[in-house]
Amino acid sequence: AWSEPRAYTPVDAQIGFKLRPARTLLIDIYGGYAYFIGACNMHAEQRYDSESIAYYSLWQNDYQRWKVGANLHYHYRDIVEINVGGNYYFYQQEPLSSIDPESPHFQSANIKGTHIFDRPNWDINARLDVHINSKWSIYSENYFAGSRMAYVQKYPEGASAVELKPIISLNIGGQYAINRWLAVYAQVNDYLNRKHDIFYGYQSQGIHFLVGVKWRF
């Protein structure tokens, strides 16, 4: 008999150092290690008679993740602020723990243990803020990620690892500060309308709009 394990992260540590080569430039370089137990990911099962997805299975596995990364922060007076950061990840997977070892899919599901499904091998965040005056500002907030693999059970081929297209999410917005504590903003997310797979066959929303209020206290 087997049972679903709990999902938790007993270790998630990071160490690094900061450099300030100029008064307006700060560079943060770091490395990290994390160990995940019972981490969840989605596995897609296709229909026998078509390419459509019949259902998704939520599976769990244990894995280790190492990362190296850097962040760059630049500002010019109180007018322009740039933040760029990126990570590269290295994974080591343990056998998938939520599959019945007696299942005929047990061996194929591991697929040599070479992939952590749905997780990117690299990601980049980039944000630009421009303060027009003390009240108005505009910004661009962007996210990129790639080298993601998905587990797909096809018929009659069997299980395989399928590469997902890179994530390119470009967002732009503006903000008006009413006072020191209160501001309103509007944002257009994914203005290229470039949908990506959150997991195989399940796409993101595409272009959409967001309005809100910020309150500092």
Regions found by a protein language model. Give the residues of each.
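Repeated loop/turn-to-beta-strand initiation elements of outer-membrane beta-barrel proteins
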Residues: R23-I29, D78-V84, S134-Y139, R180-A186
